[in-house]
Each structure stands twice: as C-alpha cells, then as structure tokens.
C-alpha cells in the first residue's frame, strides 16, 4: 500500500531522530486489533504519525513495536521507518530504551505516540525550531483543555519552565484545576535522554518505567525543561 504526505517535507537534519511508541496493547479500545492499526480514512493511525514525523524533516525514525508487531510493520511498509521491539510491556520509559541502539549518533530525539493521527508536520517543525534555538535538555509539548480529567497536569516553575508533570491520581484538588496538560510529545537532547532514563525506577503503582519521570530528573539536576505550547488541543488528541 502506498502512502501520500500532507504537504512539503521540512528541512532535514541527519542528527535528528524520532521514536514513535507503538508497542502497547491498547486495552481501552476493547478490540482484538492493536490500537495503532485502527484506521482513520482508510489508513492505519501509525502511518499518519510516521508520515507526519518524516514531513517535519526527521530523517531517522524508529517505531517501537510489540503487540501484533508483524501487522504494525506491514502498516509501515513503503515508509522509510525502522523498528525496535519491546518484548515486554514495562512502561513508556522502557519502550524508549528499547530504541536506544537504533538512535546511535543522534543529538536530538523526538518522542511521540502512535495514536495521534491529527498531529501536523508544521507543529513538529515549530517545536524543533524552538528547541534548537534555546537548547534545553528537554522540550515538552503542552496544550490547554477545558476538561483536563485524566491528563497529566503541567506545573510551571518560577522561570516559566516545566517543573513537573502531575498525573491525575497523584494531583491535589488545586492541581486538578490546572488546564494545561502534557500533550505527550517530547524533544530531548539524546545524551540527556538516555542518562536520565538510566535513573528512572519502577517504584510506582504500575511497577513500570514512566517516561514522564525524566522531567523531574532534569529539574533536580539543574537542567532546563522548556514548554512548547500548542494552542490547538484537537491536533494532539490521542485515541482510546
């Protein structure tokens, strides 16, 4: 199956890569089909996401697969995308680590989920440009929604950077009133990313490695976490 791109490809950089997380079971879909294989206008969601990343000028794209991995690979046929396997579901942080070898030589790594088919290449391109201008350890895409229930809330620091992401179950009553949320798109300096992931533990209710923990690790080590605010929340909606 061939795929079309939405618009022109942005400026490419050989040192810039992306990791697309697509190994999950998608249990909330209550479907036998892997979540990223569900179609939007007759195309699997994962194909939209991979195409968007490529259009944003990212030349090395690695899709982390696990559940129904052969079918996900087939959905990516025709796109210049590599794969890495997460054999066991040990969390989003662990999924990124599964792609570490495939990211050798990269200086910047974009991380996003495979269930965001409405994300636009120009949005990612703007995020990449902001990151390159300021060079924080981590840039985190945020947005605001009227009903933030279920999303990780963004706590801002005094310097207006991101101080932390607080998940719904851990938020106080005051924190639950925050409408700025984690959009689930990260752009990290590669050296920081993998050193931070080496410090992420599994001391949580799910006994998993959470990618979101790298925000607190960056702040504790005195490194900057910069928000990239996107004012169109519908673009970053995930599918459940």
Language-model regions, residue ranges each:
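N-terminal nucleotide-binding beta1-loop-alpha1 segment
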Residues: 9-31
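Short beta-strand/turn micro-motifs composed of small residues
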Residues: 22, 65, 113, 142-143
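Catalytic-core segments of class I nucleotidyltransferases/pyrophosphorylases
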Residues: 163-240
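His/Asp/Glu-rich metal-coordinating catalytic cores
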Residues: 109, 114, 122, 141, ...
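A short, conserved acidic/glycine-rich loop-to-beta-strand motif
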Residues: 134-144
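Rossmann-like NAD(P)H-binding beta-loop-alpha module
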Residues: 143-174
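Short glycine-enriched, charge-decorated loop/helix-capping segments at active-site entrances
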Residues: 33-39, 200-203
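Conserved N-terminal catalytic core of the sugar/cofactor nucleotidyltransferase
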Residues: 2-17, 44-129, 133
């Amino acid at each position: 199956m061939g795929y079309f791109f939405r618009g022109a490809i942005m400026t490419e950089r050989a040192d810039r890569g992306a990791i697309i997380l697509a190994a999950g079971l998608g249990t909330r879909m209550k479907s036998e089909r892997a979540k990223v294989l569900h179609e939007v206008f007759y195309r699997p969601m994962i194909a939209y996401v991979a195409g968007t990343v490529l259009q944003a000028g990212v030349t090395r794209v690695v899709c982390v697969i696990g559940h129904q991995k052969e079918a996900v690979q087939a959905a990516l046929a025709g796109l210049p995308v590599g794969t890495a396997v997460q054999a066991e579901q040990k969390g989003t942080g662990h999924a990124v680590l599964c792609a570490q070898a495939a990211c050798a030589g990269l200086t910047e790594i974009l991380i996003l989920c495979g269930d965001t088919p409405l994300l636009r290449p120009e949005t990612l391109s703007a995020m990449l440009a902001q990151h390159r201008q300021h060079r924080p350890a981590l840039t985190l895409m945020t947005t605001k929604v009227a009903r933030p229930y279920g999303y990780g809330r963004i706590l801002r620091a005094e310097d207006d950077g991101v101080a932390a992401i607080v998940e719904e179950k851990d938020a106080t009553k005051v924190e639950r009133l925050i409408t700025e949320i984690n959009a689930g798109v990260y752009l990290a300096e590669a050296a920081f990313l993998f050193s931070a992931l080496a410090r992420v533990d599994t001391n949580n209710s799910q006994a998993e490695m959470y990618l979101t923990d790298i925000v607190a690790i960056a702040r504790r080590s005195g490194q900057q976490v910069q928000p990239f605010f996107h004012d169109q929340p519908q673009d970053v909606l995930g599918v459940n």
